A protein has these predicted regions:
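Hydrophobic or amphipathic alpha-helical targeting/insertion segments
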Residues: 87-89, 93-121, 125-129, 133, ...
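Exposed beta-strand-loop-beta-strand "reactive/processing" segments of non-cytosolic proteins
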Residues: 47-97, 144-196, 243, 255-257, ...
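Short, non-transmembrane alpha-helical segments in secretory-pathway proteins
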Residues: 24-66, 116-155
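Extended effector regions of multi-domain proteins
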Residues: 2-13, 35, 97-115, 138-139, ...
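Terminal targeting/leader modules
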Residues: 1-28, 34-50, 64-68, 84-106, ...
Length: 652
């Protein structure tokens, strides 16, 4: 690809931009993060053993956001999670930056915080020095422990004797045979360690028996690729008149869209106060959980049921994006500012990419009688970030389409998690991708939290199914079919699964606002990637991921109900998630509601997924459904792209 000069084709928010607070929903600035840490550190209960899980904006009430006028004073408050290095438990604090005080504190004595980035980085060296782990490696022919690569995983909650009441991490290992080569081609099978993150001790080394370490290399870095295909001719994305969007204090406007871009350590990208042409669509949208269940019960692989958002926090794992590769075109970058365990400011430069893309044909019609044609091209605004969680990359894309649709796409790439087998004997739960190297069948199941506000906060939830009319007097030719709508008016009624047989879909409607046809304005959820979970609901992993049992859930808005697997779900028993929220069976008709959509990827591993996996994608769309009185893009000017030309004229 052709990469243009950074100074011409990209812009990153300046330090002054990052320090200016222009909107109540704007993420905390570096100065605010540091100030919050200082306020907490000077409070008597918190001392040298205190660490920070999260420091993030305490989002103001909706009425505050709705009534805000630019230039008005902005009250700033933070939500903080702190924990001790010595004891179990998490304390949730609310901190006023205006008053320099802690305004609220709540103890969660059995909770464990997310595993922190600093802990992950320390675990490898710690495990490599443990005598039992060294002995296990030696039994496999490894004498140089510097070649051993250790990936920490969350330990889950499996009631293993000796693990109760601890804060644990479980590890898998590989061997790197030479500098920079792909160590995932050399799994150290059957050797795992369990680490207590409070006492920093290896409480157990599990050795299930040695399998020869595969030695064939499978590399992806350019220095190892000796035979390369002929380069493709460049495609340049240029906007000679500049971009059509504007970013100020996180507030983004483009065409008829306006919204605020946020970011935190747990969810990564968050979107707020989403409006189209001044009409509200959603108050908040983000990806709030993902669980990755693996299908193998062999050795220590039964533990592979990781919640990348709730147990790790993908925001801290965001990449600094590279112009011309991660993002192509004329780019606006945003830096993000998070906290370290010690309360210092951690800045990830260019973590968010904003740009426009041509999106193909929007609409067209040729009147063959008059030989007249009208054509309009589509365009979309893209807001994205890419997070690396160990072996996998998760690329999050929010698309805002010119026709009023909102789309989320998750692209998964990186390297499959590998294990070893005897060559040619992968077993029933895996596929061999290299002699002696397997990838286990697994799933990536995601949950988006969509705090809808379709023309306001008073919304209802409607299910639509299509049925064939029974043959008979009303259907004499057997061709009749129709759509039936049902208002689901309580939380338990709205816990639903997809049904391809009836082409089921769901709408969020505002019963108080109607279109010209007299029907409620609405947005439709296009649930295109529903998956069937295979983990038993009654298993340890199934209880902790009960949200995957339905494809949609709808709850009455509660600001404390933020995550479908629970607020503190590291080592959780499954309580405190959305399955518990809906037991209240609150009314969800003509009120403030939250739509939770569960979708994902079913991934039987392919040979083509190794040594590095081409992107596979999943996602959903929110599309206007009677929100407008007609095609909202009928007013687009007719334009012809003058830069386009015939291929033969371009010298090919």
């Amino acid at each position: 690809m052709s990469v243009a000069d950074d100074t011409d084709c990209c812009h990153t928010a300046t330090k002054a931009d990052a320090l200016s607070v222009l909107h109540p929903l704007q993420a905390l600035t570096p100065a605010e993060i540091a100030k919050v840490a200082a306020i907490v550190n000077k409070d008597p209960p918190y001392g040298v053993d205190t660490r920070f899980e999260t420091i993030e904006l305490l989002e103001p009430e909706k009425k505050v956001v709705r009534s805000f006028k630019p230039g008005a004073p902005i009250a700033r408050n933070a939500r903080v999670g702190v924990f001790s290095t010595k004891t179990i438990g998490v304390t949730r604090l609310f901190v006023s930056l205006d008053k320099d005080i802690i305004t609220s504190r709540k103890e969660f004595p059995t909770a464990r915080p997310m595993i922190q980035l600093e802990q992950f980085l320390a675990i490898e060296g710690f495990v490599r020095e443990h005598p039992e782990f060294i002995a296990g490696c030696k039994r496999r022919g490894i004498t140089d422990m510097t070649t051993v690569c250790v990936d920490p995983w969350s330990a889950g909650n499996f009631s293993v004797p000796g693990e109760e009441g601890r804060h644990l991490c479980h590890v898998f290992a590989w061997q790197r045979l030479r500098e920079n080569e792909n160590f995932y081609a050399h799994p150290i099978e059957g050797l795992n360690a369990v680490i207590d993150l409070k006492s920093w001790e290896v409480i157990r080394v599990d050795d299930y028996g040695a399998i020869p370490i595969p030695i064939k290399e499978a590399n992806y870095e350019k220095e190892f690729i000796k035979t390369r295909r002929k380069p493709l001719k460049p495609i340049d994305v240029v906007q000679p008149e500049g971009v059509n969007f504007k970013v100020e204090g996180g507030q983004l406007t483009w065409d008829k869209w306006s919204f605020l871009v946020g970011f935190n350590a747990r969810e990564a990208l968050t979107l707020h106060d989403i409006q189209y042409d001044g009409r509200h669509v959603a108050h908040r949208a983000s990806l709030v959980e993902m669980v990755v269940p693996y299908g193998s019960p062999v050795n220590g692989h039964f533990r592979k049921n990781v919640f990348d958002i709730g147990e790790y926090g993908i925001g801290k794992l965001a990449n600094s994006l590279k112009l011309g590769c991660d993002c192509l075109g004329v780019i606006e970058y945003l830096d993000v500012h998070l906290n370290t365990m010690n309360g210092d400011v951690m800045t990830i430069e260019k973590a968010i990419c904003i740009h426009e893309e041509d999106s193909g044909l929007l609409w067209k019609h040729w009147d063959f009688r008059t030989d007249r044609a009208e054509i309009r091209r589509a365009r979309k605004l893209v807001v994205s970030t890419i997070c690396t969680v160990g072996n996998y990359e998760y690329a999050l894309y929010w698309y805002f389409h010119i026709d009023g649709a909102i789309e989320f796409e998750m692209k998964a790439t990186g390297i499959i998690n590998t294990a070893a087998c005897l060559p040619g004997q992968p077993g029933k739960y895996a596929r061999e991708v290299l002699p002696g190297v397997v990838g286990h069948i697994h799933q990536h199941i995601f949950c988006a939290r969509l705090d809808m506000a379709v023309d306001g906060d008073q919304n209802s939830f409607v299910e639509c199914n299509t049925y064939a009319e029974p043959e008979g007097p009303e259907n004499p030719y057997g061709n009749a079919f129709y759509e039936s709508e049902t208002v689901l008016d309580t939380e338990l009624k709205a816990a639903r699964r997809a049904n391809p047989a009836s082409h089921r879909y769901w709408k969020v409607v505002n019963p108080n606002k109607t279109n010209y046809a007299g029907t409620p304005v609405s947005y439709k959820l296009e649930a295109m990637n529903c998956v069937t979970p295979f983990v038993s609901p009654n298993s340890p992993s199934g209880r902790r991921s009960s949200f995957v049992q339905n494809h949609v859930w709808v709850t009455a808005f509660d600001p404390d109900e933020r995550y479908p697997a629970g607020e503190y779900m590291n080592h959780s028993d499954g309580a405190g998630g959305i399955a518990d929220f809906v037991k209240q069976d609150r009314g969800i008709k003509n009120t403030d509601i939250v739509l939770w959509h569960v979708f994902g990827l079913h991934h039987p591993v392919r040979l083509e997924d190794f040594p590095v996996q081409p992107c596979i994608s999943t996602g959903f769309k929110l599309v206007p459904h009677g929100f407008f009185d007609g095609n909202p893009c009928i007013d687009l000017p007719a334009e012809v792209n003058e830069a386009s030309c015939c291929a033969h004229a371009a010298g090919t």
